[in-house]
Amino acid sequence: MTETAKPTKAKSKRTKSASKVVPEGPITIRWDLAELPSSQHKAGLAGLALCVRFLSRNPAAQGICEIEALDAEGLALRVDSDGMQSLFDEIYAASLEEQQRDAPFKDKNKQVVPPKRTIEKLVKDKKGKEKAKTYYVYDSVVPRGDLVADWDQPPAGEAKLWLKLWRDFIWSVLRSMATTREPFTSRAEKRATQDGAETWLGLATNPSAGVELPSTYYLGAQAKTAEMASFRDVSRYQFLLHFWPYVAPLYVPATVDREGKREFTGYAVVVPEIVDLAGFVEDWATVMRERASTVAGYVPRDAIVDIAGEAGLDLAHRVLEVIRRREGQQATRPWLDGVDVFHLAKDGNNVRLRAVQRVDVRRERADEYARSKAAYWSAIFRRQRISNVLDSKPWWSGFGRLCAQTPKELTVQDTKFCRDCRVAMTEVEMKVTTESEPKTLEQLVYQAVRTYVLGRLGSKYGLKWADVGTNPALKQDYEDKKSKLAREAFLAVRSRTGDDFVSYFTATLCSVPQRLGEQGYLELARGLADENEVERIRSLTLLALSANG
């Protein structure tokens, strides 16, 4: 049975405003995972446990704030007013740090705020010429995030990139408005605050009170819905939402435009759906500390994902690897059931929730993701492959559409894309068969396409690999002509669908002698005659032609 707030060996007194009894000593309050309404609340419960443990290492902390009981189902917190204030002082700790701006800062009335000072630096313009540029120095509030900093352990002398990513997210997404930054700002400016004590009073007197639920604490919340309904929560549940940002890993989705340039598009926030609180608390620090701090652009390389949902797969893989090392290969239930991935991005002064995706934690899916992530180099190829993992689709699914809609410079003419197609169709995705086993449709298509390209290379240009030898000029000519033939066929296939594609495949790609064997011919013919298989063969054909490009 779930407990509510209760006094622990405490005298009581009444508040001036009403008949609420206020304990003078600590209260004990318990939460169980099963009663909490969302993954954010459950993550908040885990964050509470880790923050209280971290607070116990601070000798300056005052009052009582301790975990009285912690098990798989939940925890009990014993805390008094001073202890709660110390806890809030920890999670909202901040400092004033000098930051340089390339333009003067303006207040809400569009008035220029005088800087502390200005400095000049030599910078290069687009033409490479140096010129002097003025920078304006202001004191800025920076969230400390000491718990996150404790998990971020780069090599000596290098920046804590994961901490910076967390700070940027807090400031640009969760606390993008000045009014929402007050808990941090007041502490950075060393002003007295009573937010912890006030929260404790609410939990001590009326833990089940209804309260508003702003988006500062709950991702996806709105002031009013389209039906003019407001988001509401229970006080004892909303309290937990102060802590989930400490245990929600952050990722940065990257997109590639039609010119091949990469651009970061907001944040992918991974909120864990916890089913074993004690297991989570035991392993979480290890999961966080094992992330690499190698920089890519201005963020950790391990934080970059090709699609927002990939963030959930990456966390699932990391969690399962930690559990696997600790428990061995035995079938151990993970302490995560799944994750909710929130894709958030700034749009002017607003924060947009672009998508929410649920990703279940399954070993086979996590392993398939890790294999794909490691094997492929092209961001476009990798994005489609990982999207198929997320959607539980065959590895080749969607590549026909991708090749048809993406500029050829990023597919058949891109070295990395062609390399990935070759690796996929010869190593990573291919089922290993013996000579006695029938070849799969993927193997038959790859063999037919390669035979066509090499056959046309010989009949049209008189080039054979056996004649190339060690002559570098002949080898280069051979590769150039082979790529030319593959690209021409690629462009012809991508513009054809349905019966038009089938006609091209049989009349052109099969115009050279093929050695597929009777069973292979029958399997390929069945596929081309089945309208449900034609798109599969078309996708595989485009991939096979790229592999030979």
Regions found by a protein language model. Give the residues of each.
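Domain-exit/linker segments immediately C-terminal to small folded modules
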Residues: 214-389
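Long, contiguous all-alpha helical interaction modules
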Residues: 1-157, 161, 167, 314, ...
